[in-house]
Amino acid sequence: MPERDPILLTPGPLTTSRMTRDAMLRDWGSWDAAFNRLTKSVCADLVRIAGGGDAYVCVPLQGSGTFAVEATLGTLVPRDARVLVPNNGAYCARIAAILRRLGIAHVELPFAEDEPASAHAIDAALARDARLTHVALVHLETSAGLLNPLDDIAAVCRARGKALIVDAMSSFGALPIALAASGIDALISASGKCLEGVPGMGFAIVRRSALEAAEGRSPSVALDLHDQYAYMQRTSQWRFTPPTHVLAALRAALDQFFDEGGQPARGARYARNCATLVDGMRALGFEPFLDARAQASVIVTFYAPADPAYAFPAFYAAVRDAGYVLYPGKLTTADTFRVGCIGALGADEMRGAVAAIGGALESLGIAMR
């Protein structure tokens, strides 16, 4: 009898619906008109979800979300620019690492791993250093599940006349984002996160004028967003072999997203999942790492048990044997593990996950109190 697919309690890849998986059973010709129409429809819907309007365009890119982050920074940020990077986790640090490799001057503004980036502190940093031209912000820092105040920070950038580039990898589709109203210059996300597609395609939703001004700027051929967009406009095709099955799955996932009720309904389901998870884990003796005011309903970081009998690999394996896949911790200040609340899941799956975790504690002899 075949093994049942595990339920992925991770922030991507994640558990997808049967309809999304079935969409990958068809083969597509990458130059075929039907596939070109698929690309166009997906891009139009992504701009619509972001609240971009006619002033914004979507540029899809093969690869993981980080490919799209590097492509966006390398294309939109001039080499003589200076970027402020609020840093409260591993994915903020990754932006700084990309800028370093690109040779772009940047300033990291440090925050604790459980501290949302402060719009006031960002405003003060911009006031101190007139050379700063851009802010590169992670909306939802997935290393802890920490939500940064995007609207407040966008307002500061607007008031200061600074360009704002947002890594919305783990928030897009789940949390409200109004691109045009916020004045954001670029937003980056990926197929395999809160849209509930499969991994393999990133995308940037970019202010058209900013993209048009970036011709020839990227140091990369494959990661040149301007060239990718210009080629698509001329030919309706991708420059290089596209992830055809990934795009087809994303089209199916977007259809389900709209059928569910769009971002408000998707966000509400994730919030119910998160509340069910946290309540159940607290009943077992676990405590979340973050204060509830800073917690996003996408992934929750829990303190690991203090019992010496606890070791994450054995704990992970026991929960995996029960049919659920956890995510290791990514913090530098505490021993933690993470549990995702996203994917084609509801409260029943979250209760099942809590039961599996409770069973792992019992089988491994781990005391919580």
Curated annotation (Swiss-Prot):
Residues with the N6-(pyridoxal phosphate)lysine modification: K193
Domain of life the protein comes from: Bacteria
Annotated protein name in UniProt: 2-aminoethylphosphonate--pyruvate transaminase
UniProt family annotation: Belongs to the class-V pyridoxal-phosphate-dependent aminotransferase family. PhnW subfamily.
Lineage, highest ranks first: Bacteria, Pseudomonadati, Pseudomonadota, Betaproteobacteria, Burkholderiales
Top EC category: transferase
Coiled coil: none
Cofactor entry: pyridoxal 5'-phosphate
Keyword check for Transferase: yes
Gene that produces this protein: phnW
Reaction equation(s) it catalyzes: (2-aminoethyl)phosphonate + pyruvate = phosphonoacetaldehyde + L-alanine
Organism, as annotated: Burkholderia pseudomallei (strain 1710b)
PANTHER family documented for this protein: 2-AMINOETHYLPHOSPHONATE--PYRUVATE TRANSAMINASE
Record carries keyword Cytoplasm: no
Single GO molecular function: 2-aminoethylphosphonate-pyruvate transaminase activity
Described purpose of this protein according to its UniProt entry: Involved in phosphonate degradation.
Assigned EC number: 2.6.1.37
UniProt KW keywords: Aminotransferase, Pyridoxal phosphate, Pyruvate, Transferase
Subunit-level organization: Homodimer.
HAMAP family with a match to the protein in the record: PhnW_aminotrans_5
NCBIfam families reported for this sequence: PhnW-AepZ, PRK13479.1, transamin_PhnW
InterPro entries from the UniProt entry: Aminotrans_V_dom, NH2EtPonate_pyrv_transaminase, PyrdxlP-dep_Trfase, PyrdxlP-dep_Trfase_major, PyrdxlP-dep_Trfase_small, SP_NH2Trfase/AEP_transaminase
UniProt GO BP: organic phosphonate catabolic process
